[in-house]
From Swiss-Prot:
InterPro entries for this protein: Gemcoat_MSV, GV_A/BR1_coat, Viral_coat
Listed name of the protein: Capsid protein
Any single Pfam family the record assigns to this protein: Gemini_coat
Motif (Bipartite nuclear localization signal): 1-24
Places the protein is found: Virion; Host nucleus
Family statement: Belongs to the geminiviridae capsid protein family.
Domain of life: Viruses
Region (Disordered) residue spans: 1-39
MF GO annotations: DNA binding; structural molecule activity
UniProt KW keywords: Capsid protein, DNA-binding, Host nucleus, T=1 icosahedral capsid protein, Viral penetration into host nucleus, Virion, Virus entry into host cell
Quaternary structure, from the entry: Homomultimer. Interacts with the movement protein. Binds to single-stranded and double-stranded viral DNA.
Length: 244
């Protein structure tokens, strides 16, 4: 009998012990810094119609972190910005001159960081210092040895285009068919982890002349003289940091 009473007493004492409560999921989310982190700002650059990009032999270089001063989402709110991610969506269309010939070419797109832009955007030849004999072969280009402290290639992507001596509006004869070729291609890239810090002068515009340090360029060059136009958009994800 005594043994059974002790068991009941032990059971009662065990049930009276306080158990630690697990923290609720709501408490964890509240304590976490990620939940309070502000979302990234977005700027979209559209190129279509009159604003399409013409890509000649030798390439083209455009500033893309063009954050003008203002209060909108795509504006910089402070004197410093950080660009984290970029999404690139374009259709590359071979121009009428390139379509006259049967050709294939490997083109290149770069994202190039410029530590000290100096008031104007450089040309692709300034960045890569290629000789005229390599103008048609951008896959062989390297950053100039003398300017490697200024220009840093953040990303490099290759793409292939083709022409067959015909333009897209040509109609084959009724007793023949033409194989499709890559005279019109879709080019998509999404990249993160860029960490491009830009320091701005005390001006309101977002041009290269407003940048004190840290410009970001998109450089595109056609391969083997297969020139084209680019139609689409670039989307940049960034933050305004530092002092106002």
């Amino acid at each position: 009998m005594s043994t059974s009473k002790r068991k009941r007493g032990d059971d009662a004492n065990w049930n009276k012990r306080t158990t630690k409560k697990k923290p609720s999921s709501a408490g964890l989310k509240k304590a976490g810094s990620k939940a309070e982190r502000p979302s990234l700002q977005i700027q979209t650059l559209q190129h279509a119609g009159s604003t399409m990009i013409t890509v000649p032999s030798g390439g083209v270089c455009d500033l893309i972190n063009t954050y003008a001063r203002g209060s909108d989402e795509g504006n910089r709110h402070t004197s410093e910005t950080l660009t984290y991610k970029i999404a690139v969506d374009y259709h590359f269309v071979a121009d009428s001159q390139a379509c006259k010939y049967s050709n294939t070419g490997t083109g290149v797109m770069w994202l190039v960081y410029d530590t000290t832009p100096g008031g104007q955007a450089p040309t692709p030849q300034t960045i890569f210092a290629y000789p005229d004999t390599l103008k048609a072969w951008p896959a062989t280009w390297k950053v100039s040895r003398e300017l490697c402290h200024r220009f840093v290639v953040k990303r490099r992507w290759l793409f292939n285009m083709e022409t067959d001596g015909r333009i897209g509006s040509d109609i084959p004869p009724s007793n023949a068919s033409w194989k499709p070729c890559k005279r019109n291609i879709y080019f998509h890239k999404f990249t993160s982890g860029l960490g491009v810090r830009t320091q701005w002068k005390n001006v309101t515009d977002g041009g290269v002349g407003a940048i004190q340090r840290g410009a970001l360029y998109m450089v595109i060059a056609p391969g083997n003289g297969l020139t084209f136009t680019a139609h689409g958009q670039t989307r940049l994800y960034f933050k305004s940091v530092g002092n106002q």
